């Protein structure tokens, strides 16, 4: 998770002219419009919508309901900064064919330079979409930095594989 945090910070510096998304829809639009800096991909799982939804909701909460504390120290051991990031996984059933999963992050102990939306910065949007037959589509939107492993894990969970939480 610490690697993911550093990736997010790095992405913020690299994306200079891209403002932080203020909504889930803005996160999706930003990911689609900046493919070199984002992941906006789709995966089709050969499993029933209900089965995929149960698995992903369980893993979403297990893997992403975390807090990460970062402490920076000098070579002499003096602490120069300490802050805590809390990740907030959210799940919303839109209808019988769509579930929206959103990951937001709040930071304590650090001055944020950009406006932070209610609930925290938008980190990941994952849509679970019912397809015909026993198939389900996953639509993933995030920064490319630090989230490739998260997307790979989500695809495998969608396929019914029991892989561990990504470590970032």
Cite the ranges covered by each PLM segment.
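Ser/Thr-rich, low-complexity intrinsically disordered terminal regions
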Residues: 18-168
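C-terminal motif of bacterial Sec signal peptides marking the signal peptidase cleavage site
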Residues: 13-16
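Compositionally biased amphipathic helical and low-complexity segments enriched in hydrophobic
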Residues: 6-7, 99
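Processing junctions and N-termini across compartments
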Residues: 8-11, 159
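Positively charged n-region of N-terminal signal peptides that target proteins for export
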Residues: 1-4
